[in-house]
């Protein structure tokens, strides 16, 4: 037996053991399509990552190839894999990106999965996807989509990086315009950052965002001050753009910016520190989502007194994605420790009347 075939045999045995030993009562099904290099032929291929979560545990099922990312193709593959893993009766909810491919009322993946299972499921839209749309609306307040996915300022900064003295960064909070907006809440934000930094993050860019937020506020991250070389800026990764904005502002004394660019970078950074970090790192909790989304909407509307443009664009975008304030999902707040008992009682009473 060749090494390749032996590896394949071992992988098949591992999968079978996982399938046989998977002990779940109720779970949430997650999926996300990705374009990846094909490991068999030259070029790229569409793959659909399928995961189930239950009781704080995550199980990766498979990432099969799909011919195209249509709702019908996705649903067909997902249902097939659910049956392979014997979890069709255990899946109670779906977590997905809020694209038409998934949410379409006739041919969306969600409704087609329900039809295949012959029962309704709870919809738990991916809040990270929703929040990236909100960040995009803020970013495009200063850099319209006509600038393209690779905004010239990021390309310039990336090319300039080798000339920048990383020891001579300037904290964002030292800027008068920044301090005037977030100076009063600096300590509260740092407490949140400290709490989030103690939690294992699934991606390197999540950790980098946390570290840059510490530095922006004039503090030292738990692992010290370090800066990573600016990477690729893909139009679909708004996290990368957030990281670029923070770095540019930290090195604003070494990187030449026009007045318009300085204003845009400053305002995007303020939004990231004041709003985005908190909502991003709490996004995975469905129980706290209703209360968090309600507070976010209230804060975005109140922000009109400080920045009417950002307030308008961000609140309008968020208003289109208030899934967790629906009657069905708002009930999750009954389990939220941050919601007062009085509010829970009133909410419960209104539902049974």
Model-derived features: where do they sit?
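Alpha-helical structural modules in large enzymes and assemblies
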Residues: 1-353
């Amino acid at each position: 037996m060749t090494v390749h075939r032996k590896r394949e045999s071992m992988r098949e045995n591992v999968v079978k053991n996982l399938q046989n030993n998977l002990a779940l009562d109720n779970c949430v099904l997650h999926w996300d399509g990705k374009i990846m290099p094909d490991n068999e032929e030259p070029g790229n291929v569409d793959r659909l990552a399928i995961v189930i979560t239950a009781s704080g545990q995550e199980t990766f099922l498979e990432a099969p190839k799909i011919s195209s990312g249509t709702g019908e193709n996705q649903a067909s593959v997902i249902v097939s894999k659910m049956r392979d893993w014997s979890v069709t009766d255990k899946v109670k909810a779906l977590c997905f990106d809020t694209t038409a491919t998934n949410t379409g009322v006739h041919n969306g993946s969600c409704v087609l999965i329900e039809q295949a299972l012959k029962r309704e499921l709870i919809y738990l839209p991916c809040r990270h996807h929703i929040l990236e749309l909100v960040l995009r609306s803020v970013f495009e307040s200063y850099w319209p989509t006509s600038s393209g996915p690779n905004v010239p300022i990021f390309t310039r900064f990336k090319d300039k990086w080798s000339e920048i003295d990383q020891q001579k960064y300037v904290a964002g909070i030292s800027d008068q315009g920044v301090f005037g907006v977030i100076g009063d809440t600096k300590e509260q934000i740092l407490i949140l950052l400290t709490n989030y930094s103690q939690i294992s993050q699934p991606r390197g860019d999540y950790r980098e965002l946390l570290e840059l937020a510490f530095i922006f506020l004039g503090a030292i991250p738990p692992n010290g001050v370090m800066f990573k070389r600016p990477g690729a800026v893909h139009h679909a990764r708004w996290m990368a753009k957030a990281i670029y904005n923070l770095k540019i502002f930290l090195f604003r004394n070494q990187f030449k910016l026009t007045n318009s660019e300085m204003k845009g970078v400053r305002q995007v950074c303020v939004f990231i520190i004041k709003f985005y970090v908190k909502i991003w790192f709490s996004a995975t909790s469905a129980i706290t989502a209703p209360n968090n989304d309600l507070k976010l909407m209230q804060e975005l509307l109140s922000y009109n007194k400080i920045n009417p443009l950002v307030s308008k664009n961000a609140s309008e975008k968020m208003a289109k994605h208030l899934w967790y304030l629906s009657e069905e999902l708002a009930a999750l707040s009954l389990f939220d420790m941050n919601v007062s008992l009085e509010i829970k009682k009133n909410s419960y009473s209104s539902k049974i009347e």
